[in-house]
């Protein structure tokens, strides 16, 4: 959303009038006819159009440094990206300050989200054999997805290579409503993608009375 300065043009034209020249003659000689008046001067050329002012450079967006969006993108950067490139899941999660826990009988690593509620957290799951995909489970304040999505938008923009937005929609369902935002860089030979899926009841209310839930997936693939 850029604005360009518009320059105004003011044309000024002037006409110069010349006095008729007269010559004096000998008294005995007939007077010479008066010289015709000088032709009117040509109007001055209008000034050249001013060049438009240079557009101000748009500042690069920056990732937030606090809030849930900052926590989530920090896990993406420090855990997910190096993990799909072959990094060790346990070592990366531990180095990012995540704590070992169990969920549904499986070992996971968790990191608190903001709000001071123990149920608000990011959960990193063991990738198992599918090491090209990093899967995060998010439990956050009810209706608290907006700052997370804003942060993911910036993260995808700053990602190298840039990942443009691909989806922002939902699929109606009788059991769980899935609202999807996705970003992807792809060529004929590779894909780097980010998918954020909110999980809600069909009427849009939370699945859990205490928090909202979402799944966040990051992947890198070659073909």
Predicted regions: what they are:
Residues 179-223:
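Glycine-rich, aromatic-bearing surface loops/beta-hairpins
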Residues 84, 137-139, 200:
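Extracellular/secretory pathway and lumenal proteins
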Residues 1-22:
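Sec-dependent N-terminal signal peptides
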Residues 47-53, 65-128, 185, 223:
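N-terminal secretory signal peptides
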Residues 98, 109, 121-123, 136-138, ...:
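Hydrophobic beta-strand residues in large extracellular and virion-surface proteins
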Residues 117-184:
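Long, charged/polar, surface-exposed segments that mediate recognition or autoinhibition
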Residues 116-120, 140-150, 190-195, 205, ...:
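Short, surface-exposed beta-strand/loop "edge" segments at domain boundaries and coil↔beta transitions
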Residues 21-66, 200-207:
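Compositionally biased, proline/threonine/alanine/serine-rich low-complexity intrinsically disordered stretches
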């Amino acid at each position: 959303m850029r604005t360009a300065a518009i320059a105004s043009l003011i044309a000024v034209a002037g006409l110069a009038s010349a006095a008729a020249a007269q010559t004096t003659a000998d008294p005995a000689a007939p007077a010479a006819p008066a010289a015709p008046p000088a032709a009117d001067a040509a109007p001055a050329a209008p000034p050249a159009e001013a060049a438009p002012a240079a557009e101000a450079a748009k500042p690069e967006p920056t990732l937030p440094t606090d809030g849930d969006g900052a926590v989530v993108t920090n896990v993406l950067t420090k855990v997910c990206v190096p993990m799909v490139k072959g990094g060790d899941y346990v070592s990366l999660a531990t180095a990012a300050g995540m704590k070992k826990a169990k969920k549904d009988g499986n070992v996971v690593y968790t990191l608190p989200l903001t709000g001071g509620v123990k149920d608000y957290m990011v959960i990193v799951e063991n990738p198992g054999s599918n090491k090209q995909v990093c899967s995060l489970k998010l439990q956050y304040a009810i209706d608290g997805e907006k700052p997370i999505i804003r942060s993911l938008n910036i993260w995808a923009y700053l990602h190298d290579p840039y990942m443009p937005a691909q989806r922002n929609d939902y699929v109606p369902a009788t059991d769980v409503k899935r609202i999807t935002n996705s970003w992807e860089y792809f060529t004929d030979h590779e894909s780097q993608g980010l998918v954020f899926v909110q999980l809600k009841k069909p009427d849009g209310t939370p699945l859990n009375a205490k928090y909202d839930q979402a799944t966040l997936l990051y992947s890198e693939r070659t073909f």
